Amino acid sequence: MQTIRKSLGLVLIMFVLCGFIFPLTVTALGQVLFPEQANGSLVKQDGKVIGSKLIGQQWTEPKYFHGRISAVNYNMNANEVKESGGPASGGSNYGNSNPELKKRVQETIKQEGQKLSSDAVTTSGSGLDPDITVDNAKQQVKCIAKERNIDASKINHLIDENKQASPMADDYVNVLKLNITLDKL
């Protein structure tokens, strides 16, 4: 009987410790030490949340830079996910040798009518990548400049100002940040 009492006491202590004290402590530390990151790195404009620095979103208007292709169609709405039964995040699971991937890439290149950077025709692992390579951004400049009636050199300068270096891959830009800056021109 004493063994059962000790076991139940330990279960209760661990339940309170792991179920309440630890999560509340980690949440409090996150809010105090890293408030922006703990709340999703949200970007606000005029007091309204317009996106997150860490999650890509779909841009359809030709006056904006477009992010990478999304295998999940940028579906981040939990209710839509439940209704559709589809994932909120994920890659296409197409390997490099998959004929479906090759077909989709060729169709995208044919539709655009020009040579494109690899991230312009392939999905990211999560399907919600917020960044594109500088090459991808520069390939979109001509269309954006025409749509906005802005000199392309201004847009190229904007890309260079927002460029982030990557030690392991090509330099990149955050699409949301780039589009916000573009609207300020």
UniProtKB/Swiss-Prot annotation:
Keywords, ordered alphabetically: ATP-binding, Cell membrane, Ion transport, Membrane, Nucleotide-binding, Potassium, Potassium transport, Transmembrane, Transmembrane helix, Transport
Transmembrane segments: 8-28
Membrane topology classification: Single-pass membrane protein
GO cellular component, one term: plasma membrane
Signal peptide positions (record): none
Domain of life, per lineage: Bacteria
Keyword Glycosyltransferase: no
Record bears the keyword Secreted: no
Biased composition (Polar residues): 114-126
Cellular compartments annotated: Cell membrane
Residue ranges of the region described as Disordered: 113-132
InterPro entries, per the entry: KdpC
GO molecular function, one term: P-type potassium transmembrane transporter activity
Subunit and partners: The system is composed of three essential subunits: KdpA, KdpB and KdpC.
Family stated for the protein in its record: Belongs to the KdpC family.
Biological function: Part of the high-affinity ATP-driven potassium transport (or Kdp) system, which catalyzes the hydrolysis of ATP coupled with the electrogenic transport of potassium into the cytoplasm. This subunit acts as a catalytic chaperone that increases the ATP-binding affinity of the ATP-hydrolyzing subunit KdpB by the formation of a transient KdpB/KdpC/ATP ternary complex.
Name assigned to this protein: Potassium-transporting ATPase KdpC subunit
Organism phylogeny: Bacteria, Bacillati, Bacillota, Bacilli, Bacillales
Name of the encoding gene: kdpC
